[in-house]
Amino acid sequence: MANTKQPELKEPGPSDNQLIDYKKSNKTEQLTTGYGRPIGERSTVITVGPRGPLLLSDFPYIEDTQRFDRERIPERVVHAKGGGAFGVFEATDDISDICKAKVLKKGTKTRVLARFSTVAGESGSADTVRDPRGFAIKMYTEEGIWDLVANNTPIFFVRDPFLFQMFIHSQKRNPQTHLKDPNMVWDFFASNPQATHQFLFLYSDRGVPDGFRHMHGYGSHTFKMVNDKDEFVWVKFHFRTDQGIKNVEPERAKILAGEQPDCALADLYNAIAKKDYPSWTLYVQVATHEQVQKFSFNPFDLTKVFSQKEFPLRRVGKMTLNENPENYFTQIEQAAFSPAHMPPGIEASPDKMLQGRLFSYADTHLHRLGTNYLLIPVNNPETNKNVKVCTYQRDGAMQVGHNQNGCPNYYRNTFHGPEVTKPEKHLEHATFESGMAARHEANDDDNFSQPRVFYQKVLDDRGRAHLIQNIVEHLQQCTDKDIISRAVAVLANVDDDFGRQLATRLNVNLPKKH
C-alpha cells in the first residue's frame, strides 16, 4: 500500500505575513536608480526596435545587473547559517568585587545583538542538523564593543588552534566528491582523543536543540576579570535559557530538515514578533589564581569544564531579545563578532584556542566584509552614544566615516591628536606567564575523566541509551571498518560498558586492556 502520510503543516506565524504587514504600514514610493534618478519603466530594456539588440546606454539595466552580480559576499567559513535579534542586557547583580567593566555594573542596561547559528553547514543548510550551535553576543557598551563569541556547549573539540582548521575540514565536504563524509568525521575523532568530551555532548540529546530559544550559551574559554583594585580572578561565562532546555528527537529532526529547514530562524523571529521575548540569565563561575594552580588539569584547556559543585554559578544579569532585525543582510549577515573585543575589566586567558581566535576572527572579517567593517552600522561601537572612536587608523576601501577628519595621523604629536589620558584605567592587567618558546604538546593530558563524569553522572539511563544510538547510527555509515574500530577503542576509555555496547552493536572487537 502506498505511503499516504501528508507532510507536517506548520501554523502561519508573523514571519509568513511579513510582506502583508509591510504593505499595511508603508505606501508605494517612486522607483529610482541607485543614484536617485526616477525610473519610468522597469519591465523592458532599451533596444534598437522591438526586436533589436540592447544598448549600453540603458544604465538602469546595466546598474541593476552589475549590482545583482555582486549581491553575495563570502559566507562565513564556519557558522554560515544563522539568525539573530536585538535586545537589552541588564546587570542585575553586584559583581564589582571581581570586575570593573561598566557593562556589568549593577543596574546598567546595554543594547545587544545576538546571533545564533550552526557550525559546519552552508548558509542554506537545515537548522536541525546534529552540530554545535553558535551563540554570539555583541554588547554596545560605553567602553566599546564586548563580543562574547560563545557556543551552546561548554567545551570544544580541540585545545590547540593549529588543529582548528583541520577539524573544520573534517566536518565539511569531501574535497573530491563534495559530499559529507562520515569517514572524515570519525577518522579525525579517532586520531584526536581530545575531542571525546565534545563528541559525547554532540551525540547526546543536546546535539539537536529545539530552535535557538531553548539552549544555553557558554563562553567556553576561561576569561580573566579584573576589579578596580587591579585584582583578578578567572571566570567561565554561562548564559542559561529562561525558556528551559528542549531538544529535537532524531527522527523528527530529519523530518524538519526536509520540510521546515529554517524552523529555528522562524521560531526566533515569530516569538519576538508575538512579544514572547526570549531571555537568558548570565552567570559566571569564579576561581582565584591560587585555586586554578591546584587543578589536576590545565584550567585553560578548552576541552575541560570547571566543576559547578566546586565553583558554583554566580548570577550577573539577564539578556532579553525584543527586536527583530529590519534587514537580515545589513544587520545579521554583516554582523562581525570577535573575541578580541573586550571592555576594560574583561580580558583573555592563556587558553591557546582563545589566543588563536583573538587573531582569526578579525582576520576573516577583513576578508569577508572589508577593511572598514567596524564602520558598518551593526558593528559600529559608536552605536553607544557615549563612545567616540579616536584612532590613528586611516583610509582603506569603503571608508565612509569621518576618517578622523583633520586630526593628525601620527603618534605622538603636539596638535591635539588622541592621547592616553587615564592609563591606570585602561591598561591591560599584567600577564606573568613565562617559559620556553616551543610547540608544547599535551599528549599526556587526561582526555577521558571529564567525559566519564558526563556519561556516568550527567546523563541518565535514557540519555545514555540515546547517546549510544546516535553514535551507532552515524558511525556505522563509515565505509572504512578500521575507523569504526579505532573510534570505538577511543570511546571505550570513557566507560567499559559504554565501549562494550558500542562494540557489540557495531560488530567490532575491543582491544585488550593490559
Language-model regions, residue ranges each:
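Active-site-adjacent core segments of small-molecule enzymes
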Residues: 1-514
